[in-house]
Amino acid sequence: MSFFNRTAFAAVAATLFLARPSLAAEWTIDAAHSTVGFSGMQTGSPFSGHFGKFGGTISFDPAHPEAGHALITIDIASAATGDRQRDGAMPGRDWFDVAAFPTATFEATRFVATGGNGYQAIGRLTIHGVSRPETLPFTLEISGDTAHARGHLDLVRSAFNVGQGPWASGQWVALAVGVDVDLSAHKGG
């Protein structure tokens, strides 16, 4: 093959590759039927709460999970546990410091199938200005144009500088925090 033919072939191949449609479908989160919750221990007693405001974009095809991407943003000020004192303290500087860090984000840069309806979202979680690699294992059920994903992630809050001053040690509020994600989404928006 001559230089010209090899160059032409390479150009056509590159054009076809770059012009191919994305393998991942676009999904819109149905916030009314979704929750992002958290749980922990305070003075030996369990507590749980949720974030009332969150959203994001998800591109995912279970046949090609490696082509997926997601960016989820959580409004930290929307955290609620039902305990007036705890809910009043969470937005403050000793905890989430929402004036300086109003949102948390999880950006999944790839997905991995783990068998059956199990997957992992691999990416970066940013809370309180600290960004760390995290993997969220989840299960996925798809029925027509509706998807339902459930996942759980265990975090250490001090790794994200959440809980300062007297709260930093874990003596009063445990360092371990569970995050539960229960998302419904619709294909194509």
Feature locations, PLM:
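Bacterial N-terminal signal peptides that target proteins for export
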Residues: M1-F9
